[in-house]
């Protein structure tokens, strides 16, 4: 069975920015990939937080040029929230893959075994993160969109324009 592909249709400052297509490594980290896939489709309904378990309408709250673009906090929108489809947090699955190149999709966390819904897309190789963040996918189309998002980031992570997931779902 092929790994699932999901998408984000992004806006920057309210204007359409394009589509990011990501392949999820369900063959290597099935629980982590399933969490992200289901949060893209919204199929799990409402979570314990009372908010929909869905990335649609959420923002990329932290964007640091020459590092990464982070999103997935659909409960608070500021990097302090988020929720997995398994409950608030779930354990690290495996550290099979490294962070070797731009476009790597990894779980954001607050230390070991604290995965929720927050994720980041690397814009450069980040080998110092190996073994600390579960790699669960890769951008396969739309790195130009990721680079456009990166341009509205700052060294402290705030964005000069709102970066939003206008729509998202599963392609295959």
Swiss-Prot record:
PROSITE patterns associated with the record: CSA_PPIASE_1 (PS00170), CSA_PPIASE_2 (PS50072)
UniProt catalytic activity: [protein]-peptidylproline (omega=180) = [protein]-peptidylproline (omega=0)
Compartments, record wording: Cytoplasm
Family: Belongs to the cyclophilin-type PPIase family.
CC per GO annotation: cytoplasm; cytosol
Protein name: Peptidyl-prolyl cis-trans isomerase
Alphabetized InterPro entries for the sequence: Cyclophilin-like_dom_sf, Cyclophilin-type_PPIase, Cyclophilin-type_PPIase_CS, Cyclophilin-type_PPIase_dom
Keywords: Cytoplasm, Isomerase, Rotamase
Annotated GO MF terms: cyclosporin A binding; peptidyl-prolyl cis-trans isomerase activity
Gene3D superfamilies in UniProt: Cyclophilin-like (2.40.100.10)
Residues annotated as domain PPIase cyclophilin-type: 7-170
Pfam annotation, one family: Pro_isomerase
Gene assigned in the entry: CYP
Coiled-coil boundaries: none
PANTHER family: PEPTIDYL-PROLYL CIS-TRANS ISOMERASE, PEPTIDYL-PROLYL CIS-TRANS ISOMERASE D-RELATED
UniProt main location, coarse: cytoplasm
Function description: PPIases accelerate the folding of proteins. It catalyzes the cis-trans isomerization of proline imidic peptide bonds in oligopeptides.
Activity regulation details: Binds cyclosporin A (CsA). CsA mediates some of its effects via an inhibitory action on PPIase.
Biological processes annotated in GO: protein folding
Enzyme Commission (EC) number: 5.2.1.8
């Amino acid at each position: 069975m092929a790994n699932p592909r999901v998408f984000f249709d992004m806006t920057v400052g309210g204007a359409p920015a394009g589509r990011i297509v990501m392949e999820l490594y369900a063959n290597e980290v099935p629980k982590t990939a399933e969490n992200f896939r289901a949060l893209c489709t919204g199929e799990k309904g409402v979570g314990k937080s009372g908010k929909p378990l869905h990335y649609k309408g959420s923002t990329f709250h932290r964007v640091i040029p020459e590092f990464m673009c982070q999103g997935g906090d659909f409960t608070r929108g500021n990097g302090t929230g988020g929720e997995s489809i398994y409950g608030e947090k779930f354990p690290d699955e495996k550290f099979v893959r490294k962070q070797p190149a731009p476009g790597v999709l990894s779980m954001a966390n607050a230390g070991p075994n604290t995965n929720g819904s927050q994720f980041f897309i690397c814009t450069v190789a980040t080998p110092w993160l190996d073994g600390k963040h579960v790699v669960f996918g890769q951008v396969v189309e739309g790195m130009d969109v990721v680079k456009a998002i990166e341009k509205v980031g700052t060294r402290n992570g705030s964005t000069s324009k709102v970066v939003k997931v206008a729509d998202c779902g599963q392609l295959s």
